[in-house]
Amino acid sequence: GIILELADSIQENLGTDGLYIDQIAAAAPYPCYAHNHPHPAGGGEFWYHAYRDMMLDLRRDHLKDGNVVFSEENAECYIPVFDILLTVNTPHSPSCRIVPLYPLIYSDRTLTCAYTYTPYTDVTKGDFRHENMQCLLYGSQLGWVDPRLLWVNDESAYEAKFLKNLTEFRKKQHDVFIGGRYVREFVPEGDNPYVNVPVFGGDYMVKGSEWISPDGRRVLYVVNSDSKAHKVTLPTGKKITMQPISAKRIDL
């Protein structure tokens, strides 16, 4: 099929380390009433079965060793056939609170990238830093951003530095984020400013999450998205100082 031919061509001719296949984990399984199709009229499960069979074929006979394949969004039924899911469909507004239900349930079964759309025109208003802080705490891959918005000026270069800090920190957390379980989010007490984040509403500059590694170790992650240092208190009672635009791991 066309998808399998493209998979071969992209890996062979472009030398990529993986494949991104749009829409599969995002497309709704609309009912089909075609009389010549071998399923009950109005059935929709054929979408899943057909995509699953195609992806199993791709992984078995077309995906190069060591390469990954990921798709758009995060329909649960496709977790077994993709390595990474691009989760950018999280709705948010100042009038609602995001509940990290997906990582709570599936963090030990799949890897995610991002969790909502990145700013389209300006990364210096606060929402970009807030999003990347949340991404790290959820265990998601970072970097879902238009690079043309970074390094435009000193302000945007600072945002790029924050992203780089978190990215370099995250690459050392594979022992937890790969196969580990996201347990909860928490807000450290103490010197922790509460601010208005554009398109998100009020939230804290320093936030944290608790994980359990695949071998059962409890780990806390804390991120300071502010340009100032803050001394905060963890749920364990321990006091720590978070440097500007930084992340920290605490093994319990």
What is each stretch, according to the model?
Residues 21-29, 71:
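Conserved beta-strand positions
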